[in-house]
Every structure is written in C-alpha cells, then in structure tokens.
C-alpha cells in the first residue's frame, strides 16, 4: 500500500499531465470553448482508480455536458497518460463536477442576507427606542 506522500505526488503528476492533455490534445469544441480546471484528484490507495473533480466558469447544464464529454474521452486520456508517464498501471478515471465553489458562494450569500436582516432589525429597534 503506497504511503500518503506517494499518493499526493502521483496525484499531482496526474493533475499536471491531464491538464496538458485537456489543453492540447482533445479536439472537442465544447471542451475547447470552456475554461476547465482540475480542482482535485482523489486517488485510491491501490492507485487503481481516481476521481477527477473539475471546475468551470460555465453554467451548470454546460458543466454537466463537459463532465459527460470528459467521461466519454477518458479512454483516450488514459491511453495518452500511459504514453507520457511511467506507471505500472494508469488508474481508471471518473470525471466529476466539483460544486464546492458554488456551495461556498451560496453560503456566503446566505451569511450576507443574515447580516442584512440583523442590521435591519437593529435599525428598527433603535428607531423604536428613539420614539420612547
């Protein structure tokens, strides 16, 4: 079983190489016309499987299409990776949409709304105290 340092090092190498493949080797208009970033790679302890989380500036429906296209192209990506890096076995890949940024923004929006509500309530209380 590989140690965490080795898994992190291999994940970093996979991220770098897959990014290069996405930028230079894939001939897909949907993928080329949208900014795609690999945010995280989760590699299994036995190095056989990896989940590749992507972020994009595109809308949710387009991001789903991007993930579908990437999953259709994963055989090509895996084959190209095998030619570029020395690994006993290139891991099976699954591409997923990383929604962490979206969730973080919605939490920030909720916090801002709560802050505004509290500010409005405090203003009403001050206004009522002045009338007394």
Curated annotation (Swiss-Prot):
<keyword id="KW-0690">Ribosome biogenesis</keyword>
<comment type="subunit">
    <text>Monomer. Binds 30S ribosomal subunits, but not 50S ribosomal subunits or 70S ribosomes.</text>
</comment>
<protein>
    <recommendedName>
        <fullName>Ribosome-binding factor A</fullName>
    </recommendedName>
</protein>
<dbReference type="InterPro" id="IPR000238">
    <property type="entry name" value="RbfA"/>
</dbReference>
<comment type="similarity">
    <text>Belongs to the RbfA family.</text>
</comment>
<dbReference type="GO" id="GO:0043024">
    <property type="term" value="F:ribosomal small subunit binding"/>
</dbReference>
<dbReference type="Pfam" id="PF02033">
    <property type="entry name" value="RBFA"/>
</dbReference>
<dbReference type="InterPro" id="IPR015946">
    <property type="entry name" value="KH_dom-like_a/b"/>
</dbReference>
<keyword id="KW-0963">Cytoplasm</keyword>
<dbReference type="GO" id="GO:0030490">
    <property type="term" value="P:maturation of SSU-rRNA"/>
</dbReference>
<dbReference type="InterPro" id="IPR023799">
    <property type="entry name" value="RbfA_dom_sf"/>
</dbReference>
<dbReference type="InterPro" id="IPR020053">
    <property type="entry name" value="Ribosome-bd_factorA_CS"/>
</dbReference>
<comment type="function">
    <text>One of several proteins that assist in the late maturation steps of the functional core of the 30S ribosomal subunit. Associates with free 30S ribosomal subunits (but not with 30S subunits that are part of 70S ribosomes or polysomes). Required for efficient processing of 16S rRNA. May interact with the 5'-terminal helix region of 16S rRNA.</text>
</comment>
<dbReference type="GO" id="GO:0005829">
    <property type="term" value="C:cytosol"/>
</dbReference>
């Amino acid at each position: 079983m590989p140690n965490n340092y080795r898994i992190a090092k291999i994940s970093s190498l996979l991220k770098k190489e897959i990014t290069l493949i996405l930028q230079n080797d894939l001939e897909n208009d949907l993928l080329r016309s949208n900014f795609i970033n690999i945010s995280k790679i989760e590699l299994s302890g036995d190095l056989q499987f990896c989940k590749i989380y992507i972020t994009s500036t595109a809308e949710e429906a387009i991001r789903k299409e991007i993930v579908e296209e990437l999953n259709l192209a994963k055989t090509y990506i895996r084959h190209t990776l095998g030619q570029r890096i020395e690994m006993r076995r290139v891991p099976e890949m699954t591409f997923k949409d990383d929604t962490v940024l979206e969730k973080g923004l919605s939490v920030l929006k909720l916090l801002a709304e709560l802050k505004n509500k509290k500010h409005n309530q405090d203003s009403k209380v001050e206004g009522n105290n002045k009338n007394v």
